[in-house]
Amino acid sequence: MNQQMIKTIITEVPSKLTILWQSGKQTIVDISEYINSPGYEKLKEPKFFTSAIVEEWGHGVEWADGEVGIDADSLYRLGKEQAGLAFPVTDFNAWMERNRLSLASAANALGITRRTVVYYHGGHKPIPIYIKLACIGWETLAYQQAA
């Protein structure tokens, strides 16, 4: 996957960013989960939230003081998840935990590389819907075999 690059952004208080990507595509991303996380508390202030700018070279979004920011790949992944075009990382990690799978065993179960599982597990790349389907299928078969 190529690194995503941001061209412009528009903020919408309290938590939405409309992102125009260098590719010409547009995404609306709700960053509520960031705003409610430690280190991002300043984003709750409307004036601070609307001070967002595109980082140099389009690698992310940063706010007025330069100490708060979100990288482009995370925004891209989050936008895909919110649009229903990617399997949410929280659901993928819950599947791994529920089935007591390590990174290597999850990779083996899904027929993908361990490195890919690391990217998915850490939220570094959007997780394709077919991986969600594979997780559901694997879990269904595992339950049937256990019965």
Residue map of PLM features:
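Motif-centric detector for short Cys/His coordination patterns
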Residues: 1-147
